[in-house]
Every structure is written in C-alpha cells, then in structure tokens.
Amino acid sequence: MELKGVQPSNGSPNGNGNGATNAASTEKTDAEKPTAERTNWGNGLEFLMSCISVSVGLGNVWRFPFTAYENGGGAFLIPYIIVLFLIGKPMYYLEMIMGQFTSQGTVKIWSVVPGFVGVGYGQAFGTICIISYYSSLLALTLYYLFVSFQSELPWSYCRDEWTNCVNSRPEEYVDNLLTGVSLANESARNLSGIGLVANNETEKLQSSSELYFLNVVIKEKLDISDGVGDPDWKLTLALFVAWVVIFLVIMRGVKSSGKAAYFLALFPYVVLFVLLIRAVTLEGARDGILFFLEPQWGELLNPTVWKEAVVQCFFSLAVGSGPIIMFASYNRFDHGIYRDAMIVTTLDTLTSLLGGITIFAILGNLAHNLQIENIRDVVRSGTGLAFISYPDAISKFQAVPQLFSVLFFFMLFVLGIGSIVALQSTIVTIICDQFKGWKYWKVALTTSVCGFLMGLVYVTPGGQWILTLVDFYGGTYVVFILAIFELAGIVWVYGLQNFCDDIEFMCNRRVSLYWRVCWSFFTPVMMIIIFIYSMATIEPIKYSELYFPEAANVAGWLLFAIGAAQFPLWGLWYASRHPQGTYWKSLKASLKPSDRWGPANPETRREWVIFKNQKAPQRATQKDTSKLGFFWRKIANFCGSNK
C-alpha cells in the first residue's frame, strides 16, 4: 500500500467523498487518537490452527454423517457443496474480513452501521445459549473417557435389574440370533431401542450400551412436567473439570489459546485416521460406507434437504455466532486471510466426509455383527449417536476395545474443547472490548464460573430435554436470522462497493466477481428463502419422539424472541442516544458509519482515509448497468446508505 507519501485528511469516509474534511485541520477525531495496542497472534499459523479447531469439531464427526444420511445420503453432498460455495464460504470470508479490518469483536465491529449493533448483542446471546449446553456434552464425553479405563467397558454388559437387555458383546447377540430372535423391521422400532421379533410378537429389547446411557449416565426422565431433577454428582464433577480446562486454555487470551490450537486442531486428525484405518478393515464396513454414500436423488427436490444443508454449514463452520470475527480481530492488519478462509472451509468439508466414512464403516460392522440387513436400524441421531451407537460398536471390537474407546472419546473431548474455547473467547472479547480496563483473565474466570453454573441444568435427569429446547430456539434460529441481518448491514446498508474498497485497501487485491455476486444476491436471497421456509414448516419439537409440554414451547419461543429482539431494540437505543433532530433522522443517521469505523491503528487509518477519498471520484463516474445492482442500491439508499 504505497500511500505513505500522501498527506492524510481527517474524517470517516463513506465512500462518496463526504468523509473527507479539511486536510489542514490538526484536530483528531476519537477514532484517530492513539489506542491501546491489541494483542496479536504469535504467528499466522496460530490463527489458522484456531480457525480449524473451531470449524472442524463435533459437527463433522457426529452431526454431519447422520444429517447426510437422513437427507439423501450421497445426494446430500450436492446441495451441501452448493450451499458451501454460495453461503458458507462467502459468510466465512466476510466475517474474517470484518474482524481483521477493525481489530474489534462481534459488537464493536458495528461502528460500520451503528444501528445494527443489536446484531452483535443478539449473536452474543445465541453464543451464550450454545455454550451453556455444549459444555454438558464435554461432561458426558469426559465421563465415558474415564470409565473406558476399566478392565471391561461398563456399557458392554447388562445389569441384573435391566429387563429385556442384550449385552453389547458380539457373542451375546449371536446367542440371541441362534435362539430364533430376529430383528424387527423399521416399523417395529421405537424410542426405547432396538425392536426384536420373537414368536410372531414384538419384544422390545435394548442393548446394554443404550440402557447404560439412559439409566446409569443421564438417568433419563421421560416427563419434565414436574421438573428436570437434581444434577448428577459424577456429571457435575466432569462438567467442572471441563470448565477448568476451558479456563486454562483461554486465561491469557490468544497467547495461551494460540499455543493450544496446534494440539486442538491436529490431534483429532491423528485419532480420526487411526479409527478410519481400523473401521475400514472391519467386516461389514464396505456396506456401511456404501449405505452412507449411496445417493437418493429424489431428495434433491425436497426443500428440507436444502434447509438442513444450510443449518449443517452454519453449525460446522461456526459462522453467525462470532468466533470467526473474534479470531480474525487478533490478526495483523495485513494478514493474508483469503488463503486461510479457503483452507479452513475446504478442510472442513473434507473432514466431514472423512468422519462420515469412518462412522458408517463402524455402523456397518455393527449391523454385520447383529445380522441386520438395514443399517438404518443401528443409526441414531444427536447424543444417541455419540453415546449409544459408537460405544456399542466399539465394545464389539475383538482387540483392545478399551484403547479405541479412550482414543475415540478423547478425540471428541478435544474437538469439543476447540469449539467451546472459541465460543467462550468470543464472549470474553466482547466484554473486554466494552470495558477496556478489565483484566482478561478475570473476565475469563468469571464467565467460566457462569458457564459452569448454567451447565448444571443439563446434567440433570431432564437435561437432554433442556438441551434440545435451547439448541432449537436459542441456538439455531437466533444465529440464522441474525446472520441475515449481519450480511444485510454490510452489503446493503454500508454498501457492497464500500466494503470491497476496504478489502482492496487491507488485502491489496481487487475483490472478484464471485464474492460480489454472492454477497449481494445469492447468499442473502438463499438465506432469506430458507429462513421463511423453515418458519412456515416449523413443527413442535420432540425429544425421543415425545412432544414437549406447552409451557416448554412457550419458554422456547420466548428464548428466540429475546435473541432476535436484540437487533431492533439496540438500534432504537442507539438512535435515541445520538439525536439528529427528528427521531426519523436519528434512525437514518444510525445507518451511516460512525467516526470509529475503520482500521484501529491511527497511521493505517489515515492511509485508509486517503485511499477512500481517492476512490470516491472514480465511483462517482461509474455507472452500474446491472438491474440487480440498481435494485440493491435503491434499497440501500432508502435505508440511509451513502453508497
């Protein structure tokens, strides 16, 4: 950026020249006053490893395989890859740019459009909801990890008090099969476990791994109308250990989390490849892999499949919740984020495929051992897949199942830590950006204690009900709708050309047509259509095929309303605190960049002001003949943009 020799001018440019003020003025704006230097990553590799650790997580190993299977198998890869290129990659790159350009967290970046600051607060709310239950999954993972060191895996055999139980040891299944007990078809399956048919009547048998999870680990309640119960002390202890680890990783900010990122990002691949090699050598693995990859082409015409592809993409890449913005804010201003964005989004997809092949190879072996023709009968979703199907399959390994169990659950724990560290750091960064004098480690400690206390509700007998409710209302939909507003605020209000100019200044490269078309049209339009479809087809949520009490659904919608309402409420608050005559003028003014928008470093900011002022005359003479561009510009102008 060869701009050093040009005399700077003060102001906050909007891209049309109005931000340029008298160059001779010696008075500095608030944005130009020296600010405390923001901590940077030790090197660019730490940033890359951190992004990998958050984006390549539990969603790749235990959510993607089942989601793909339920939505067309191999055919699901087509809408998923399309969604990745039209929504996932553009949103990921956009959030990286926003964080690095301003060196600010999820809330402070909205100096670009102050009236949209509620997007940042709403995303923080959604992130807190996700953190609250994510840590409970770590507690379950730790519990299984600890008990895997026993001489015999505790879920591989039945207890005396369990009726209709079949040991998860392979020989026990063979014994049952030899006595003439055959597995029921899919219509005989129910929430309680594997349906078995004997003497022309359906006898409900459950594997010991399922009964162990339901009766010993979570002590499941099937009715929460009278409350969720008390926290289990073993899971509470595991939850405490998980939060201690989280705090130790984030206590020194990127100085500590950046070093941990190498292990958090790379170790899961070591274990995943070990499990892959073992899985593909098992009998029945080929059938499981083909079952996973076999396309069901008719599903491509199902709108639900496309909706699930978007949800999976958001969940997997962690866009819309703040971690990517937060991580990028600790980069040097000239860091090459384009390369990192391409690496992470591509690696994320490949890891999902790798995880799917590994998991379905194991499930194929499980079906082979059970002599089940339809692998659907051994597939579970969500928590059941991680803590029932996997342990059940591992217990059937002939050689050292304890070793593979330890490796598997330690891998899950590391994947979970990588994700929750990013989410927790997002909240800590938001607080520290707001209150500059607060010590980072003290904020990290306080938020970790709060996270532990919130997590207690999920380690109760009714905890899985609450997890399902919070994830559905407070996580998925809040994050999704605010991501739409996030994109609209940058592209339609601040202006696509303004944003592209900022990227050109920071990265010293022009923005390609692909990014422009995605940001201005394909990404927002697809997201809006899918959100409307999701709302129009929404159904009451269920847990284990049981509907939630009416009061729980009311609480869920209230949770969603609180998260979504952050956007308009904070916008109105900002307009009232910065009056510009009439209230309508104040609202329009809140849609223009504030003096604080721009690079954090004063010298870099002055260079950016010059660059923008040089660009303004060029853009004033350009004529956009695109009807689409004209349409979006009219919308932006109506909203008060100076595009």
UniProtKB/Swiss-Prot annotation:
Record field: compositional bias (Basic and acidic residues): 27-36
Listed InterPro entries: Na/ntran_symport, SNS_sf
Keywords, comma-separated and alphabetical: Amino-acid transport, Glycoprotein, Ion transport, Membrane, Sodium, Sodium transport, Symport, Transmembrane, Transmembrane helix, Transport
GO BP annotations listed: amino acid import across plasma membrane; D-amino acid transport; neutral amino acid transport; sodium ion transport
Topology of this chain in the membrane: Multi-pass membrane protein
Ranges where the record places region Disordered: 1-38
Cell location: Membrane
Highest rank taxon of the organism: Eukaryota
GO molecular function: amino acid:sodium symporter activity; D-amino acid transmembrane transporter activity; L-amino acid transmembrane transporter activity; neutral L-amino acid transmembrane transporter activity
TM regions (residue ranges): 41-61, 74-94, 111-131, 231-251, 260-280, 309-329, 343-363, 403-423, 449-469, 476-496, 518-538, 554-574
Annotated Pfam families: SNF
Residue numbers on the Cytoplasmic membrane side: 1-40
Family: Belongs to the sodium:neurotransmitter symporter (SNF) (TC 2.A.22) family.
Identification of the protein by name: Sodium-dependent nutrient amino acid transporter 1
